[in-house]
């Protein structure tokens, strides 16, 4: 796989909008042509080379390209937006919308990600080794269809409303989450290995949420179905005992499932 290395020159006070940082756009271009790719700096159209040193070996196919961002890009948005193939490795933090609309390929962020990581994601893999802010795998503002495919893994903590309006795919949070994970969820799987503050699965109609830690405050719209051990979801087994709930029956005909680890959640057992 050919590697193209972007080294940040500086991170400006006004965020960069860079949806063109993806293998699909770099494919078939020389290094000089990649330097001339357009990005947004506020309301100005600028060149990628104005803010990044560019080096490496180009390739004709997106699937043969690995973009390495060698430094922190905490003020660069939309990296990998709607990418379909190839790889991106970010050796630092990223701003909002990393992997938004992603259809294929793989993005790895070695630092933290701001809000809307993997928004409206449809395929591929997004891995964040640090923390993620709010709306991981959520819908576009005003839409009622969120993430529908792919896998998002956050090794740290995540914020509010992860998987909002989720329609498919899988989100794994290895740390804790804030309020309303899986709000308006219709399908897919959310795995929370840490704790959740409150309102897990609020107004969910379908899909599955597994919480291995403690749910501090649970919603009243869920029907208790008993205890299940070594649960299996989509061919994957999760060992241990879990309280099983169906809901959220604030929504007519809701069939969403929330599993909460017995060892951490005796306070929500009916």
Swiss-Prot record:
<feature type="repeat" description="2">
    <location>
        <begin position="99"/>
        <end position="111"/>
    </location>
</feature>
<feature type="repeat" description="3">
    <location>
        <begin position="118"/>
        <end position="130"/>
    </location>
</feature>
<dbReference type="GO" id="GO:0019386">
    <property type="term" value="P:methanogenesis, from carbon dioxide"/>
</dbReference>
<dbReference type="GO" id="GO:0046914">
    <property type="term" value="F:transition metal ion binding"/>
</dbReference>
<dbReference type="GO" id="GO:0018493">
    <property type="term" value="F:formylmethanofuran dehydrogenase activity"/>
</dbReference>
<keyword id="KW-0484">Methanogenesis</keyword>
<dbReference type="InterPro" id="IPR054942">
    <property type="entry name" value="FMH_DH_FwdC"/>
</dbReference>
<feature type="region of interest" description="7 X 13 AA repeats of [GW]-X-X-M-X-X-G-X-[IL]-X-[IV]-X-G">
    <location>
        <begin position="80"/>
        <end position="213"/>
    </location>
</feature>
<dbReference type="InterPro" id="IPR017550">
    <property type="entry name" value="Formylmethanofuran_DH_suC"/>
</dbReference>
<protein>
    <recommendedName>
        <fullName>Tungsten-containing formylmethanofuran dehydrogenase 2 subunit C</fullName>
        <ecNumber>1.2.7.12</ecNumber>
    </recommendedName>
</protein>
<keyword id="KW-0560">Oxidoreductase</keyword>
<feature type="repeat" description="6">
    <location>
        <begin position="182"/>
        <end position="194"/>
    </location>
</feature>
<feature type="repeat" description="5">
    <location>
        <begin position="163"/>
        <end position="175"/>
    </location>
</feature>
<comment type="pathway">
    <text>One-carbon metabolism; methanogenesis from CO(2); 5,10-methenyl-5,6,7,8-tetrahydromethanopterin from CO(2): step 1/3.</text>
</comment>
<comment type="function">
    <text>Catalyzes the reversible oxidation of CO(2) and methanofuran (MFR) to N-formylmethanofuran (CHO-MFR). Can only oxidize formylmethanofuran. This enzyme is oxygen-labile.</text>
</comment>
<feature type="repeat" description="4">
    <location>
        <begin position="144"/>
        <end position="156"/>
    </location>
</feature>
<dbReference type="InterPro" id="IPR036485">
    <property type="entry name" value="Glu_synth_asu_C_sf"/>
</dbReference>
<feature type="repeat" description="7">
    <location>
        <begin position="201"/>
        <end position="213"/>
    </location>
</feature>
<feature type="repeat" description="1">
    <location>
        <begin position="80"/>
        <end position="92"/>
    </location>
</feature>
<comment type="similarity">
    <text>Belongs to the FwdC/FmdC family.</text>
</comment>
<keyword id="KW-0677">Repeat</keyword>
<comment type="subunit">
    <text>This enzyme is composed of seven subunits FwdA (65 kDa), FwdB (53 kDa), FwdC (31 kDa), FwdD (15 kDa), FwdE, FwdF and FwdG.</text>
</comment>
């Amino acid at each position: 796989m050919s590697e193209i290395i972007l080294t940040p020159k500086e991170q400006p006070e006004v965020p960069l909008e860079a949806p063109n940082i993806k293998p699909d756009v770099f494919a078939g271009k020389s290094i000089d042509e990649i330097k001339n790719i357009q990005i947004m700096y506020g309301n100005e159209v600028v060149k990628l080379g104005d803010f990044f040193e560019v080096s490496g070996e180009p390739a004709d196919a997106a699937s043969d390209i690995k973009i390495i961002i060698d430094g922190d890009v905490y003020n660069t948005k939309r990296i990998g937006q709607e990418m379909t193939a190839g790889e991106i490795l970010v050796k630092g933090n990223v701003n909002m919308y990393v992997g938004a609309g992603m259809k294929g390929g793989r993005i790895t962020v070695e630092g933290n990600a701001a809000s809307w990581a993997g928004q409206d994601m449809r395929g591929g893999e997004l891995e964040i080794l640090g923390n993620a802010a709010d709306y991981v795998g959520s819908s576009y503002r005003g839409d009622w269809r969120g993430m529908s495919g792919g896998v998002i893994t956050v090794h740290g903590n995540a914020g509010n409303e992860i998987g909002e309006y989720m329609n498919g795919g899988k989100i794994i949070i290895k740390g804790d989450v804030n309020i309303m994970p899986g709000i308006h969820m219709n399908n897919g799987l959310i795995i929370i290995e840490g704790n959740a503050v409150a309102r897990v699965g609020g107004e969910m109609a379908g899909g599955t949420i597994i919480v291995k830690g403690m749910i501090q405050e649970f919603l009243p719209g869920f029907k208790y179905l008993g205890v299940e051990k070594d649960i299996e979801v989509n061919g994957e087994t999760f060992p241990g005992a879990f309280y099983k709930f169906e809901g959220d029956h604030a929504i007519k005909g809701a069939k969403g499932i929330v599993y909460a680890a017995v060892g951490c959640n005796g306070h929500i057992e009916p």
